[in-house]
A protein has these predicted regions:
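C-terminal motif of bacterial Sec signal peptides marking the signal peptidase cleavage site
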Residues: 25-26
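Electropositive
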Residues: 79-107
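Exported/periplasmic cell-wall-interacting domains
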Residues: 48-52, 100-105, 110-197
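A structural motif detector for short, solvent-exposed N-terminal "entry" segments of globular domains
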Residues: 47-90
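Short, solvent-exposed loop/turn elements at domain surfaces
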Residues: 69-72, 80, 91-94, 116-119, ...
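Bacterial N-terminal signal peptides that target proteins for export
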Residues: 3-16
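Short, low-complexity, disordered segments immediately C-terminal to signal peptides
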Residues: 31-45
């Protein structure tokens, strides 16, 4: 029990240091610099319009390194939520049970109330790109289970973890309950969700 408490204390200290460094130097997700090809604004400029998303009724942009989820309507900024938590293990999702949050472009494919997390919005992970990445990981001997599923955006029963920036989910994106309830009312099934580092 003592080692578990020490481990949690170390995790909290690490999380605080990362949060302070991000605040001092700005968060710079790798995909914003290269992978997304400039389709999203640089960190700290989430209020800038997204020209390519002007035909989308809603778009959710999740930035793991900034610990934010931003909602756009027809390419225009609506709201940015902070206190976001992710899968316990950093890095891109490879297989079921790896406790990682996937990166990529998805759609919300189902919404429901949830007894533990207030609201749950299911995304269409794994998409074709994820399945291809998983196939390659199996061929390379990296993945030994399927790609996984049941990834979504939900509330929290660990509010303090979200507040401290501690990642605790099995791969989902977690918001504070009042935030996920507000988002849930805004976005319909079919909403685009872009998750990046």
């Amino acid at each position: 029990m003592k080692s578990m408490a020490l481990s949690l204390a170390a995790t909290v200290r690490c999380s605080i240091v990362v949060t302070l460094l991000a605040a001092l130097y700005g968060c710079t997700p790798a995909t914003t610099q290269s992978g997304s090809g400039g389709i999203v604004p640089p960190p700290g400029d989430d209020r800038a319009p997204l020209e390519w998303a002007r035909s989308e009724p809603y778009l959710i942009l999740v930035r793991r390194s900034c610990r934010t989820l931003t909602l756009y309507q027809y390419g225009q900024w609506v709201r940015t939520y902070d206190k976001v938590a992710f899968g316990r293990v950093p890095g891109a999702k490879v297989q079921e049970g790896d406790r990682r949050t996937p990166n990529g472009l998805y759609r919300i494919v189902g919404k429901r109330e949830h007894p533990r997390w207030s609201r749950f919005m299911l995304i269409d992970y794994p998409n074709l790109s994820d399945r291809d990445d998983h196939r390659k990981a199996v061929e390379d001997g990296i993945a030994v289970t399927g790609p996984g599923g049941e990834i979504g955006i939900h509330g929290t029963d660990k509010e303090r973890f979200n507040e401290l920036g501690i990642d605790w989910t099995l791969g989902c994106v977690s918001l504070m309950n009042e935030d996920v309830e507000e988002l849930y009312e805004f976005v319909p099934d079919g909403t685009l969700v872009l998750i990046e580092d």
